[in-house]
């Protein structure tokens, strides 16, 4: 049996990590474990009843929700989004449907986060590490460096009342979002361009001192900027849609992401040196506009919650398979994997 990380241990770890980054960690939230568990249980109960008769208990209104995803088809979060769309249409008897746009068709991450707040976009898979920038502090702690030792430990948290509490804390922050569930891509690691590899003397492994002065592209979030700065790099916030050309032109020396995103977006073509530092986990969160959420009745909310659970499972299963497939393809793709030989200095 896997040992789940406790709420106390989790908050202790994130407090230490946040202090190391010079950040404020929320040791608590207006959400409580008992409240979040009740919300989760109620949603599961309602959703189970809904499954017995698709569409029963709904308002009878038809809803077409718009979902934007910044990645392409060959990506876990996109697989999760498709699963969500199929499940919610099934559970609602066709009364709730999803229009899914991929490759950032409707905007960047920052534009999508703002769109959710303003109500011009219904659903977006955002990064938990971005949410403190928009007023939801507690859930952002999942993006702190080295909080989770592996994906199994994160899954333990996601399946627990603590996972429910973290999701509930977004709604309780009253910042315009409701967190429906998780879409996690796994560990995020560094990758560097050939020019940087040459400059570093063509290393056979990677050490923390090599991070010094590297211009590293990060998402437009304070947490990721502070993380890279703490590792000795020079963090540069650039929109995801501009990352490929920024690496190609030398605007940045390196970037960081999960290996599935690295491959599906062809970043390996311009940065074929992948460093296995796994400094954080890509804790994606399915976000909905709060006013839109409040417009649904209890049965409809139950269907949406169940669809989010199905999406999380599909995303997780896809990523488990794809991660290994990506690493197995490195040799054929001309990618060099650089192991970190002093990982204790990074943690």
Regions found by a protein language model. Give the residues of each.
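A short hydrophobic/aromatic micro-motif that marks alpha-helical segments and, especially, helix-coil
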Residues: 21-22, 165, 312-315
